[in-house]
Amino acid sequence: MGCRDVHAATVLSFLCGIASVAGLFAGTLLPNWRKLRLITFNRNEKNLTIYTGLWVKCARYDGSSDCLMYDRTWYLSVDQLDLRVLQFALPLSIVIAMGALLLCLIGMCNTAFNSSVPNIKLAKCLVNSAGCHLVAGLLFFLAGTVSLSPSIWAIFYNSHLNRKFEPVFTFDYAVFVTIASSGGLFMTALLLFVWYCACKSLSSPFWQPLYSHAPGMHTYSQPYSSRSRLSAIEIDIPVVSHST
């Protein structure tokens, strides 16, 4: 498998990266990070559940799909440390992952549409597809770490809240969506690393174009006769001898 070809591994990693970024978007916007369930013993009243997200908060009665209270300014007054950290970490992870997707796309497009012989005028602008995929893999790994760590911490912080107050806090499915998306980012990075390691025997340097040697004036010179480069000593001059 050569680095000059677009393989299923790079295409699959790109699609996996898109799905993971979409999952991070969903996890960031979902108002289902933590539930606070308030149980009443009055038969004339219903139990109340408060759904807490990173940006909004919603309170519902049991059996109702409408929010009794919908706080759109919750993100300004978040009083839970793990959610405050997630407000910063998840958008940062999305930005890093989108940059990795852009690098991955540049590498694939350069591999698919670039000619085998580069233009001498564009020699300084040539891109190493393998280098793009390697850096993209590192960025995907970084994005997964940035999003996974605070998401797991939110689970343990939930236990801290139950010990500090009452056992009424539970984490909701947005935590699982984010953890699964972070796992997808790690899988994307792994696919790109495997692809790079499979073709690392290529002799091109890390960030040089994917050719056996860097293109230059001596490599792509205008065609002319090879004998014109020979010196007078190297040119074979026929000698005519007269027999006596």
Curated annotation (Swiss-Prot):
Subunit structure: Interacts with OCLN.
TM region(s), chain numbering: 11-31, 88-108, 136-156, 175-195
Extracellular side: 32-87, 157-174
Localization of this protein: Cell junction, Tight junction; Cell membrane
GO CC entries: bicellular tight junction; cell periphery; lateral plasma membrane; tight junction
Superkingdom of the source species: Eukaryota
Gene Ontology biological-process annotations: calcium-independent cell-cell adhesion via plasma membrane cell-adhesion molecules
Modification Phosphoserine occurs at: 228, 231
Function: Plays a major role in tight junction-specific obliteration of the intercellular space, through calcium-independent cell-adhesion activity.
Membrane topology category: Multi-pass membrane protein
Gene: Cldn12
Protein's name according to its UniProt entry: Claudin-12
Origin species: Mus musculus (Mouse)
Keyword entries, A-Z: Cell junction, Cell membrane, Membrane, Phosphoprotein, Tight junction, Transmembrane, Transmembrane helix
GO molecular function: identical protein binding
InterPro entries, sorted: Claudin12, Claudin_CS
Protein family per UniProt: Belongs to the claudin family.
